[in-house]
Amino acid sequence: MGNITRKGSRDLVVDSAKSLEDGPSAALHSKLYEAIMREDCTTIEVLLRNHPVNQPITILPNSASNRLLLTQPTESIIPIHLAAKYHKAQSLLCLLRHGADPEVRDTTGLTTLNLMLLHWPVTSTTWAKPGNRTHRILTDIQNSSITCLRILCAHGAQVNTQGEISNKRSPLHLAIAYGCYPVLSILTQNGADVNAINEASMTPLHMAANMLNKEMMETLIAYGANVNCAVSSTGNTPLKLAVCTASSKAGRLLGAGVSCIRLLLTHGAKVNAQDYKGQTAIHEACFGGREAIINLLLEFEANVNILTRNGESPIYMYLQRSCNVRDTALLARLLYHTYPLRMTNNQGILPAGIMLPEFRLLRDTLIKQSQKPLSLQGICKRNIRNIYGEKYKQHLKQFLPVTIWNSVYCCYDLAYTS
């Protein structure tokens, strides 16, 4: 006896393509394809009498219908996948009613829901005038896509199933990656796990925060996303990722991210959470040097005295870049909260940005200050500022004599930067 092997669905896809030209299947496949694309449910029902609903169809190069679908000589596709990719709601519903399996996978391991999200239409209407033809077309496309998603969910599509070769991303991860904002609430209402992790151990909120997509972040948080979940490989939280992106050159130029960071902080993000290198959000913000973000973190009581595992303070990170050093007002604000002032890391190395000749006087001044202990009064002032922060300083004014309050809050350490 020869070797007997079991053929799975992937083998059937290949075999059907090889044998298609040898029989009447070519015409049947072509007609079924065209009926699905036209959403001709009557014809679909007739053709399914002679074609198993979960078996792929293959369109040949000389098929007229092939123009819309194929860029390769032949392509095999399962009928329900075809309807999902092109968001043909009536065809999708017809196929499901005739036994189509929403969990059937293609040769790359993707389910119907995975494929639908991967082909979600980009239909932003912000540039189109409401009511005109373009706006109506885009709105119709979006509505058709949403209808297809609702149909799939209503027929038992698994909303937490991960694609085999899609970096283990759940449908929610795919929706975030491909900008499918309307999808989020539908998936979560149908049981999608908002705290599921992908192959990189990132939750959907990690991804949305990294992209500074506030709408998606709001939806995920509303459905219970953990704002303090840390990526297992790095220790990064959504807050740290949002601060990193917002502090980048692009974030600075676009003025993006402040509202996203505030959203996380107001929903309980731990402002002083440290990653595996010991860095906090304020370390990242200080390195980026974007004043609005630094001020926001300070407003939520970010600790400017936390050291990384390598002994680097937020001030150290700020002084790493010469462009930051030139902003003496922001430097003074950071010094206003800092004690003790630590100018080197664990290896005794000074920040690179302050080593330029033009900063020699400032460098020498800061080094001297770091070696000189503050007076007890100065230490007390800093402790009060760090304990009560910016949010409670007006409240504190009700309990302290005016002269003391002014000495605590109205005198920046400008002598450091003079």
From Swiss-Prot:
Family annotation (InterPro entries): Ankyrin-SOCS_Box (IPR050663), Ankyrin_rpt (IPR002110), Ankyrin_rpt-contain_sf (IPR036770)
Keyword annotations of the record: ANK repeat, Repeat
SUPFAM superfamilies xref list: Ankyrin repeat
Pfam family, one: Ank_2
PROSITE patterns noted in UniProt: ANK_REP_REGION, ANK_REPEAT
ANK repeat residue numbers: 27-57, 75-104, 132-161, 167-196, 200-229, 234-273, 277-306, 310-343
GO CC terms in record: nucleoplasm
Protein name (database record): Ankyrin repeat domain-containing protein 61
Native source organism of the sequence: Homo sapiens
Lineage of source species: Eukaryota, Metazoa, Chordata, Craniata, Vertebrata
